[in-house]
Amino acid sequence: MSAVPMKAFLAGLFLLANAWHITAINEQHQKHHLQCWHCSSDTIGAEDFCDVTFQEDNIPTDLIKERNINLLRSCNGTINSDHERAVCRKTVEENNGKLITKRFCYYTNKSDPVELCNITSPEKNVRRIFCEDCLTDRCNGALAGASILEMLLLLPIAGLIQQFAI
């Protein structure tokens, strides 16, 4: 085999290997479904763990198993779109004078900013107090702004470490 056909053969083999690798990575990525908490503080028994502050330790695991309730949902399972994406959503709303916290899967346009849920209007006679979309597993159980608070608490410690290092 001469040098030119050998180079063409190797280049073709390289392209096929890359195409297979990209396909395998895409299939792996598509198999991962976003995991979101799914609960409402308005549900009897859920107020102990699904309130404004999510208390995973307060989830009544025996009751959940007995009634076959799944509080963690796979969100991407029903979506196959180039234009939509699954997000985990947490809302706090006032409905007829009662404060209700909900956590669930939601689908938005990929082009929409994550902050859009603060702008959209809820149902009639409902006043939205808080809304947050997030894109990582179980993120709708976290406190709003927890990462910012952690950063604010860590900054003075980082400053002290840097001061002693000099």
From Swiss-Prot:
The keyword ATP-binding does not apply. The chain crosses the membrane at residues 141-161. It comes from the Eukaryota. One of its GO terms (biological process) is regulation of neurotransmitter secretion. Glycans are attached at residues 76, 109, 118. A lipid is attached at residue 140 (GPI-anchor amidated asparagine). Residues 25-140 are extracellular. Residues 1-24 form the signal peptide. GPI-anchored targeting the protein to the cell membrane. Disruption phenotype: Viable and fertile with no gross anatomical or behavioral abnormalities. No reduction in synaptic terminal size, number of active zones or number of synaptic boutons at the neuromuscular junction. Reduced frequency and amplitude of miniature excitatory junction potentials at the neuromuscular junction. It is found in: Cell membrane; Presynaptic cell membrane; Secreted. It is a lipid-anchor; GPI-anchor. Keywords: Cell membrane, Cell projection, Disulfide bond, Glycoprotein, GPI-anchor, Lipoprotein, Membrane, Secreted, Signal, Synapse, Transmembrane, Transmembrane helix. Disulfide bonds join 36-88, 39-50, 75-105, 117-131, 134-139. GO terms for cellular component: cell projection; extracellular region; plasma membrane; presynaptic membrane; side of membrane. Residues 162-166 are cytoplasmic. The name 'target of wit' comes from the observation that expression of this protein in certain regions of the central nervous system is dependent on the BMP signaling-pathway activated by the receptor protein serine/threonine kinase wit/wishful thinking. May be involved in the exo-endocytic cycle of synaptic vesicles. This is UPAR/Ly6 domain-containing protein twit. It comes from Drosophila melanogaster (Fruit fly). The lineage of its organism: Eukaryota, Metazoa, Ecdysozoa, Arthropoda, Hexapoda.
